[in-house]
Amino acid sequence: MVEFYINGQQVEVQLEDEQTVGDVLKSFESTCEENDAAVIGIAVDSKQITAELFDEEAAKPLGSNTKFEFSIVTKNDIKASFEKLSALFNELAAQMEGVPVALQSGKNAEVSESIKRLADSIEQFCHVATLASLFPDTFSTGSLNGISFKDFFAEFSPILKDFEDALQNNDTVMLGDLSEYEICPRLKEISKALQSM
């Protein structure tokens, strides 16, 4: 019996006239498109199907015990992720506003943790933005005040590096200025932009 798993969950699928692995993959892709979803990973009989292997694997005949495992993402998943990131960036903006006071109170570890969360959040944003590119009709307006997200983060990265350097050098004046006047406003911009996606 042919088995199907979507995001780790077994599902019942009715095959029609599919004869090859490729027929099944094409049919599944069409179904995903009809349901505002995109395939981001495929395994057939526990073998990951990469772009290099796709044509070779697709030509194989469909066996009676073939196991298909699909990883998919939906537009709604991406919207929900952007909403969570918006709230997270807003929360981080508030934390960054409090950096000068935290430093004066000797809470350097708290400040370091905020920066780590910020870096993790930016990495998470980049991952979600990459997935969003699978739906260009829905998520094509990725910009902040007319600047692409890519350019925005290219400008933001040196500021974060300066903040990290100031933290290592215990330069509380620089840390306060960067967090209050550079980082916090940018986090608010990101949060606002993500709310409208």
Predicted regions and their residues:
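Long amphipathic alpha-helical segments with strong coiled-coil/leucine-zipper propensity
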Residues: 33-140
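Short, contiguous acidic and Ser/Thr-rich linear segments
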Residues: 6-22, 79-82
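Short amphipathic, charge-patterned alpha-helical segments
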Residues: 17-33
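Alpha-helical oligomerization segments
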Residues: 154-197
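Intrinsic, low-complexity N-terminal interaction/targeting segments
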Residues: 133-154
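Amphipathic alpha-helical coiled-coil segments and their boundaries
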Residues: 78, 111, 142-145, 149, ...
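Intrinsically disordered, low-complexity acidic/proline-rich regions
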Residues: 1-4
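Short, charged, amphipathic alpha-helical segments
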Residues: 112-117, 150, 174-181
